[in-house]
Amino acid sequence: MMMPDDHHPLSFPSYVLHQEHIAPNPNPNPNPTSSNSAKRKRNLPGNPDPDAEVIALSPNSLMTTNRFICEVCNKGFKRDQNLQLHRRGHNLPWKLKQRTNKEQVKKKVYICPEKTCVHHDPARALGDLTGIKKHFSRKHGEKKWKCDKCSKKYAVMSDWKAHSKICGTKEYRCDCGTLFSRKDSFITHRAFCDALAEESARFVSVPPAPAYLNNALDVEVNHGNINQNHQQRQLNTTSSQLDQPGFNTNRNNIAFLGQTLPTNVFASSSSPSPRSASDSLQNLWHLQGQSSHQWLLNENNNNNNNILQRGISKNQEEHEMKNVISNGSLFSSEARNNTNNYNQNGGQIASMSATALLQKAAQMGSKRSSSSSSNSKTFGLMTSIFNNKQAENIKTKEVDERGFTRDFLGVGSQHRSWPLLMVNHNLPDSSPPASTDGTPTADMNQ
């Protein structure tokens, strides 16, 4: 029973003393440089040993297949050792080169036969014969071997065989369509391709032509609709003035420039325009014509204070309309939303020069200022209101039509697709007749 107790105090101090005498080894390999120095250092390509023998071969000697030829059978061999073994078969003296420890083998280096090549310099010579052969073939030789899959050519057979094994198994395709078999080449090309794409993305792209034309067309149509709504309000104002006592109005039909147009034509004109290009362009022409007429009406209101003064009797109005239809020029107009076609009656406007018309306008202006009882000439734009065959009174704007030239009124040799102002130059000048109730009325035949 005392043995464990005696053994324990004896064994524990001895274990402690043993651990104290053991010193750790910080460097398990105390002499690593000695083993590395014993290894042979490989020279870098193009950095030969200064003590090496430099050999310069001609292109023919370098690229020849069999440099060593047997003098008996003219068989060629790549190495001299192979030739010596072949000579033994002919019972010729042969000798293999044997190396001894006493002999110092001098290292050989080869330069490229191409004078413009960087490896033609002895300081950049290549260290082995096989390496200089492949270099000359790759850089300066003919590419004889072609891949059947990708049609890529190689000058060295070993390169062609290595490529044939991996061709088509793994490829890297760029977004531009270029194929790469090597990942590093693909990454380099992809970086350049992405930079080119970012540079091209900075340029501002041209908007599509159809969308641009549609937007511009919509702006013009909306602007025309605003002008048309303004004219519609003025037309309503004129109609309200016609509702005064002494005027009997009926808005079922409106005679415009000698043409009887239903009132729904003007109502439909204020509706939203269609999206088609042809309807929109037609609407623009129609609105432009109406805007020019409205401008002429406003200008005439500023210069004439006696417009819409007297009513016209039934006989006078019927007689006036007959003269207008027989002498005036009638133009056709097509409603945009209603496909109603109106007949076009040809007419001729008296051929007068612009100077003559202006002189005539000055003369007529002096007559109006001198005589308070004289009435203005009939203005081209007439707004007559009819109800079947009943006589109606109308307010008409009277101004000398000879005071405006044909070009100014927009009445030319060509016909328009919208109603134009009609000017009658052939009506004789006469004094206004008196009505049955004694009130002077405007004679439309003036």
Curated annotation (Swiss-Prot):
Top-level taxon: Eukaryota
GO MF entries: DNA-binding transcription factor activity; sequence-specific DNA binding; zinc ion binding
Record's keyword annotation contains Nuclease: no
Residues the record lists as binding Zn(2+) 1: C147, C150, H163, C167
Predominant subcellular localization, coarse grouping: nucleus
Pfam family, one: C2CH-3rd_BIRD-IDD
Composition bias type Polar residues, residue spans: 427-446
Phosphoserine modification, residue list: S58
Region described as Disordered: 20-53, 425-446
C2H2-type zinc finger locations on the chain: 68-90, 110-140, 145-168
BP term (GO), one: regulation of DNA-templated transcription
Tissue specificity note: Expressed in roots, especially in vascular initials, cortex, endodermis, and quiescent center (QC).
Keyword annotations of the record: Activator, DNA-binding, Metal-binding, Nucleus, Phosphoprotein, Repeat, Transcription, Transcription regulation, Zinc, Zinc-finger
ZnF (CCHC-type) ranges: 172-195
Gene Ontology cellular-component terms listed: nucleus
Description of the deletion phenotype: After germination, roots display aberrant divisions in the quiescent center (QC), but normal radial cellular organization. Reduced SCR expression in the quiescent center (QC).
List of residues binding Zn(2+) 2: C174, C176, H189, C193
Subcellular location(s) per record: Nucleus
Function: Transcription factor that, together with JKD, regulates tissue boundaries and asymmetric cell division in roots by a rapid up-regulation of 'SCARECROW' (SCR), thus controlling the nuclear localization of 'SHORT-ROOT' (SHR) and restricting its action. Confines CYCD6 expression to the cortex-endodermis initial/daughter (CEI/CEID) tissues. Binds DNA via its zinc fingers. Recognizes and binds to SCL3 promoter sequence 5'-AGACAA-3' to promote its expression when in complex with RGA.
Protein name listed in UniProt: Zinc finger protein BALDIBIS
